[in-house]
Amino acid sequence: MIDFGIQYQNYQSDMTRMCFIGEPDPKIKEIYDDLGKPIPSSGNLDRWVSQGVFPMNSVLTVRAHQTGSHRNRGWETFTDAVIKKLSEERENLVFMLWGSYAKAKISLINTSRHLVLTTVHPSPRSAEYGFFGCKHFSKANDFLRGKGIPEIDW
């Protein structure tokens, strides 16, 4: 599971399910840059989802052009419950918590059963302060491989 923290959206209707549509969001560009892979023509993450990755924001909606506009409106209750349920009922998950808002969710996770990776948010404003070079994707695959679980083709 990847918790992107609070998302801002620059355009209306540019996110569908757990994926961005249209031109990649700046955060998606930063993620692919860190992976050393070419930036895709869209921000669609269906390929990751089909391998078991669950990208989720702490707050699932936002008013266009208003960063964090739906914070403290109830989404956190739902997303916290999702994180707790996954932590309690599954084993050997990798939680990537990006940004201070997402990092605060670590208390919901049983860290003895799961790998928890934290760093700054992958936004263009903060990625250079710890996201680049954090190696979360290779660390996740190392953990999965060590548990006999198929790696993710990021």
Question: What kind of feature is each model-predicted range?
Answer:
Residues M1-L97, Y101-A104, I109-T118, P122-A127, ...:
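A polyanion-binding, active-site-adjacent surface
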